[in-house]
Amino acid sequence: LSLTIRPIEQNDVERCGRIGSQAHKTISSAHGYPCEQPSEEFGIGLIRMLLDNPNSWGILTERQGTILGSIFIHKFPPSPVAVIGPLTVHPSGEGGIGKRLMDAALVQAHKQNHDQIRLVQSPSHIRSFVLYTKCGFTLREPLFLMQGHSLKTGNNHASNRSTHPVLDDNDISMCNELCKSVYGFSRDMELRQAIDEGVAFMIERDGAVTGYAAGIGILCHAVAKSNEDLKALIGNASTILGPGFFVPARNYEIINWLLGNGFQIGWPANLMTLGPYQEPLMPFLPSLAY
């Protein structure tokens, strides 16, 4: 029987959310990692949040009215990047469902004129790595999700460099210029959202920004001119947003510093890209998106 692919609608939210939760639970239990979606309620809430986001677009695949999987694609204007995820397929789904969803998402990304497409892959799920590789994605950066408590409270070894909130258009402009030097483009929308949420902060020395964070957490990103600046951003965050934050596994200095300050590695992940990619030459923290 043929598969149907169509946009996700509001009355699909609960079924898609439950499938996402079941899929993550099956993979995590098979490999001994904590589940990235701790409950069905979390999975349903995630789908509802993404469906309500005007910068996200979701599709599902079904057979005779039974939903088998879903996928989302996101844009972050003015960034040229489109992001894919989460891709979830029901554990009982047959082979080829994920490929159909990926193909449909990539077609949509190209229709929106995105030539840079990115995702964060869970390496515990080898099948997804194979799928993304066959779709043309390249592994760019192995990541660790670091979990722990804010270093701003209690006895710790946080950096003594000071930070202050990102406040005005001049601050935003300087942060965007630093971001461009790292990524090749700004992440202006995400930075402004973090400002609205009161979690964006920066380091400024001699009139120049040497680092900023759009929050410290799994949905946040940060860039810095040095590891000492990055330590200051992490160390001065009043809270860790979500289950933790991603750190490039190749940044031994930051990983070792975090471990020495009581953090633990939650699970590994991989940043993968399709299309043009500028490798960051300065320290950075990616988000769950990229």
What does each of the following model-derived ranges do?
Residues 9-10, 52, 56-58, 62-63, ...:
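Intrinsically disordered, low-complexity, positively biased terminal segments
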Residues 96, 100:
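Glycine-rich phosphate-binding loop
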Residues 17-58, 63-72, 180-200:
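Active-site rim helix/loop that mediates acceptor-substrate recognition in acyltransferases
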Residues 4-18, 140, 161-174:
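A short beta-loop-alpha structural element at the N-terminal edge
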Residues 118-122, 138-152, 265-277:
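Conserved catalytic-core motifs of GNAT/GCN5-like acyltransferases
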